[in-house]
Amino acid sequence: MHRQLIRIACVICVMVGANQVMGQKADPAPAPAQPAARPARPTPPARDPNTAGFVKATELPDGTNPAADADGNFIIGPTHKKAAEMTVKEGVPKGTVHNLTMSSADSKIYPGIARDKGTFGTVDPADPSKLIVTTSRPTPYTRKVAVYVPKQYEAGTAAPFIVGADGPDGSLFVALDNLIAEKRVPVMIAISIGNGSGDAQGSQRGLEYDTMSGLYAEFVESEVLPLVEKECKVKLTKDPEGRATMGCSSGGSCAMIMAWYHPEWYHRVLTYSGTHVNQQWPKNAETPGGAWDFHERLIPNSPVKPLRIWMEVGDKDLLNPNLMRDNMHDWVLANERMAKVLAEKGYHYQFVFAKNAGHCDGGVKQQTLPEALEYVWRGYKGEGK
């Protein structure tokens, strides 16, 4: 039997060799399956602010903004004119911008991850709300941090400040120059923090901005703010009334997450096109809907927190931008639902529905940012007051 097996093996070797001589190659092994690429975003439809189920809102004359002291829901557009405060003005004191760099090698909280280039993930066949990502790996990063210190800042005093996502944000600094000079907002420092790279599930940015926990706020508190105070020779207030968060898209949901999980640190929130949807990764059993849970159950079922919130969404904001179809990826509906539950709980908030506006619409920001900053900072009396 043993000799027969040897003969068979020899015959096979001869046949393979003959095929190669005749120019015929053995069939190659099948290539391993490639991870799914991120799908292209579909063009969102324009949504009607008067759709049944949306919040009742006051439609303003085209080109105008809500008053800076007005709570509630408002409709603006369809044209978006740049506010005068968004332009550098001669004679207005200009703040100093310090440009810092942070490395993942120095972070105890975020050592860094990234999704392989050209990959995304696949939906769990058993759970449409869960994205399986197999191509996210430890990856180092560097981030920029731009710190705006107004000309009027008095050295040694504890200053109010605003923390912004996806920095640096030069337009914020221009607005603050003008608003501070006109005494419409306090003399504040702005800390515009770059993200750790990438976007959405499996990326460092997604981990920072979409995770429903206090971790990013803790990173800012323990790693960013001490660096800012040391390198920029400033003192930052510990008073949550003098601290604000700001962002767009996932940076907007991050702004809300920071204040929600750490209201002892932040009382003021400003968001454009907030990603209050199911984008958290990895999935967390405590908040299975990610930031969708804000309006689904967290805000409705929690005691009112001392937050003042300004928020905006565009009529052409994102709708199912990736392959997940879990009924929790509608940015317009998410922000409408946020406005509804905030009103029901009695929060001070202003919600702007912008017509003829897309996701993180630049024209809308140029029109509304000065008024949004005024609204968010309304009622601030100063350090220790």
Model region roles, listed by residue range:
Residues Q24-P44, K385:
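Disordered, low-complexity segments in secreted/periplasmic proteins that are enriched in proline
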Residues I8-G17:
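Bacterial N-terminal signal peptides
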Residues M1-A9:
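Bacterial N-terminal signal peptides that target proteins for export
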Residues P42-E59:
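Short acidic, Pro/Gly- and aromatic-enriched capping/linker segments at domain boundaries
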Residues N19-G23:
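Sec/Tat signal peptide C-region and signal peptidase I cleavage site
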Residues F54, P61-K385:
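Non-catalytic cap/lid and distal C-terminal segments of serine-dependent acyl enzymes
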